[in-house]
Curated annotation (Swiss-Prot):
Residues 3-167, 180-353 form the EngA-type G domain. The gene is der. The keyword Ion transport does not apply. Associates with the 50S ribosomal subunit. This is GTPase Der. One of its GO terms (biological process) is ribosome biogenesis. GTP 1 binds at residues 9-16, 56-60, 119-122. PANTHER family: GTPASE DER (PTHR43834:SF6). It comes from Burkholderia cenocepacia (strain HI2424). PROSITE patterns: G_ENGA. Residues 354-438 form the KH-like domain. Belongs to the TRAFAC class TrmE-Era-EngA-EngB-Septin-like GTPase superfamily. EngA (Der) GTPase family.
Length: 445
């Protein structure tokens, strides 16, 4: 699994700025999705061929006793305990603060690898910036400027060396013969463990722990209607006899890693609760990771018609950026709607892995342009000439032509919808890339 780097520090030291810099290559993929909040706290970064997950823990108040600060501190502690590396950020301009000492005292006790990073160090001599912070007893401070990028690459490379060194070797969880890997994600108490047991059946459980990580990820192999699947633990599911029960302590780290490791994600919602920002954040990460997605709205049997209409409206309004995914209204406890849910899992996986021939893609592109041309930008109208597939899981369609920087986001979404309809790409994100070039086949008979 991808290593996790947790960003920790008191408020206003630049954690979000560093987060944005570390994940910048991914921001564009989700920033323009209608309805998706930009206030994200986790994302993916990449240095060369090494991907990693980043968690921005928010302002850390380790001594908070109640209220929202206490909850933030609890979530931060959990993220720290599950991270591979902790980047502890302090403010070089304001110097050492009492709160920094409290955080350092806590971090030293965790046993996690700690990188002490002095932010806002631009234009300052290292000795002037770093001297105060040696007092924290966390080794040599690393001076950076998250805003300008100074020192960030060296720092993250060092952190990744440590993070990857602690990663276990990938075992047979990557064996393609094991079938579609499914992650069931959602907030506590939405019914994840109930759905797992409904899917697997108590007498057909084949479960084992994959050792080697401090998080003891669990992979559960099962068959349904003759097809093989593997469930990835996301909820702290632990086997008790023949039944899985949830240790209902929501873990951002486990959720992110499970999404990243899955072929298809089932986002499970509680029909009796409003969709939260946390639900939207998780959904946004699924899209960012390019994972196929199916939405399950659980506990549907407990709602009357008015409440059902309200729940559907809430889903449409708050998760409209997931309009490519099928939604199923289910009862995991009564095992209703499970069959249709799993058929959508199969369909979403097939769509994510679809092979799209260049002639058919180009024909679909030409038909889309003939039906609705892209708008001019000033005197220039984009010319879309041909298309080919650039990747799978998720499908990437590369469109070649001229003046493609003038293509609007609205027209890009129009093309996406046309391709989805033509090639039945339901349940998977779809990436469209534009490249200005000549058609190499134009002069060939």
């Amino acid at each position: 699994m991808k290593p996790v780097i947790a960003l920790v520090g008191r408020p206003n030291v630049g954690k979000s700025t560093l987060f944005n810099r570390l994940t910048r290559s991914r921001d564009a993929l989700v920033a323009d999705l209608p309805g998706l909040t930009r206030d994200r706290h986790y994302g993916e970064g990449r240095v060369g061929e090494r991907p990693y997950l980043v968690v921005d823990t928010g302002g850390f108040e380790p001594v908070a006793k109640d209220g929202i600060l206490h909850e933030m501190a609890r979530q931060t502690r959990q993220a720290v305990e599950e991270a591979d590396v902790v980047v502890f950020i302090v403010d070089g301009r304001n110097g050492l603060a009492p709160q920094d000492k409290s955080i350092a005292d806590y971090l030293r006790k965790t046993g996690r690898p700690i990188f002490l990073v002095v932010n806002k160090a631009e234009g300052m001599k290292y000795t002037a910036v770093a001297t105060d912070f040696y007092e924290l007893g966390l080794g040599d401070p690393r001076a950076i400027s998250a805003a300008h990028g100074d020192g960030v690459t060296d720092m993250i490379n060092e952190a990744l060396e440590v993070a990857y060194a602690g990663q276990p070797e990938e075992a047979d969880e990557d064996d393609p013969s094991r079938g579609i890997k499914i992650a069931i994600v959602g907030r506590p108490n939405v019914g994840k463990s109930t759905l797992v047991n409904a899917l697997i059946g108590e007498d057909r459980v084949i479960a084992f722990d994959m050792p080697g990580t401090t998080r003891d990820s669990i992979y559960v192999d099962f068959e349904r209607n003759g097809k093989k699947y593997t469930l990835i633990d996301t909820a702290g599911l632990r086997r008790r006899g023949k039944v899985f029960e949830a240790i209902e302590k929501f873990s951002v780290v486990k959720t992110l890693q499970s999404i990243s490791d899955a072929n298809v994600v089932i986002l499970l919602l509680d029909a009796q609760q409003d969709i939260s920002d946390q639900d939207a954040h998780i959904a946004g990460f699924v899209v960012e990771q390019g994972r196929a997605l199916v939405i399950g709205v659980n506990k549907w049997d407990g709602l009357d018609d008015h409440a059902r209409d309200r729940a559907k409206a809430d889903l449409t309004r708050k998760l409209k950026f997931l309009d490519f995914a099928k939604s199923h209204f289910i009862s995991a406890a009564k095992k209703t709607g499970i069959g249709a849910l799993m058929r959508s899992v199969d369909d979403a996986y097939a769509a994510a892995m679809a092979k799209l021939p260049t002639p058919k893609l180009t024909r679909a592109l030409i038909e889309a342009v003939e039906f609705q041309q892209p708008r001019r930008r000033g005197p220039v109208r984009p010319k879309l000439r041909y298309a080919h597939q650039g990747g799978q899981n998720p499908p990437i369609i590369v469109i070649h032509g001229n003046a493609l920087d003038a293509v609007t986001e609205t027209y890009k979404r129009y093309l996406e919808n046309r391709f989805r309809e033509t090639f039945s790409l339901t349940g998977t994100p779809l990436r469209i890339e534009f490249r200005s070039s000549n058609n190499p086949y134009a002069d060939k008979g």
